[in-house]
C-alpha cells in the first residue's frame, strides 16, 4: 500500500553565485540509513493543492528513491517522469486513479534514462508524451533495438526545444529546457502559481553526482539557470522529498557538490594520469559520504577528463 506523508571558467562563477552552503549534516539518500525498508514504499506525498510526488525504490537496486511529479487538474493529469519498470509505473498509474477520476493526458519525459522511462508503456496509450529533441532521438534509437517480448520504448510525439506552456483547466504548467546536464536533453517542469519546480535528474538529493552520460561543466551552467527560476519547492529526480526549506538547502548543497567534483576532476587531469589511476588521489571532502560516491566518483572523473580532452559532443 502506498504511504502518504502530509569547467574551469565556470567554477568561480558557480561558487560565487551559489548561496552559502549550510553546515554539513548527517544526511543520506539511502532508505536504510533512515531506518526504512522496501516495505515502506511506494510513497505519495502531497506538496500543494492537487500536486503530489510519487516515490519508489530505484529500479537498479541502489537503495534510494526515484521521484515523479503528479499535477491534477479539472482538465486531466500531467505526470513528469515515470519509473523504471512497467510494474512500478503501473503502481503510479493506479495511485493517480485513486486520487482522481481525471485521465492522465500528458507525460513529460524529463530524463530519457531507463530508470525514468522503462515503465512508460504502463501509461494510457491516449497520453501525449513530451521530451526534448535530444531525448526523443535517444528514445527513437532505443526503440529501434527493442527486443521481442520485452518492454516497449515509448517515443514522445511532442518536443520542447526551449520552453512550452501547457494550460490544463486553470493550471499553468511550464516545461523548460535549461541546457545539458545529467543527459543531453534534460527538461524541468515548473508550476509558476504554486512556485514548485520538478528538476528531475538535474538535481538529486544527497547523491554523489552521477555523470555516466553527463556534460560536467554544462551541468553547472544549467544549475545556474535552474536556480534563477522562482520556486519555493524544488523536487529532485532521486532522493528524499522533504519540506521546502530543506529542499532549498539541499539544492544549494548539490550545486556545491557539482562545483567540487568538476574542480577536482580538473585538478586530477593536470596530474597527467589515466582517470582510473587519478581517482585514487581525489579529495572529495564531505562528498565521499554522499550516497553512491563509491560507484559514481570514478565515472565522474572519467567524464570530466573526457570533457577536457574534447571527447564530448
Question: Where do the model's predicted regions map?
Answer:
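Conserved beta-strand hairpin/beta-sheet module of binuclear metal-dependent hydrolase folds
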Residues: 45-95, 187-201
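Metallo-beta-lactamase
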Residues: 41, 46-47, 135-179, 183-185, ...
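Divalent-metal (often Zn2+) His-rich catalytic cores of metallo-beta-lactamase-fold enzymes
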Residues: 190, 218-273, 277
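N-terminal pre-domain segments of enzymes
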Residues: 20-42
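C-terminal regulatory/interaction regions
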Residues: 270-313
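Active-site neighborhood of phospho(di)ester-bond hydrolases with catalytic His/Asp-centered motifs
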Residues: 80-82, 105-113, 130-133, 178, ...
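Hydrophobic h-region of N-terminal signal peptides that target proteins for export
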Residues: 8-18
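Active-site HxH/HxHxD metal-binding segment of metal-dependent hydrolases
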Residues: 94-167
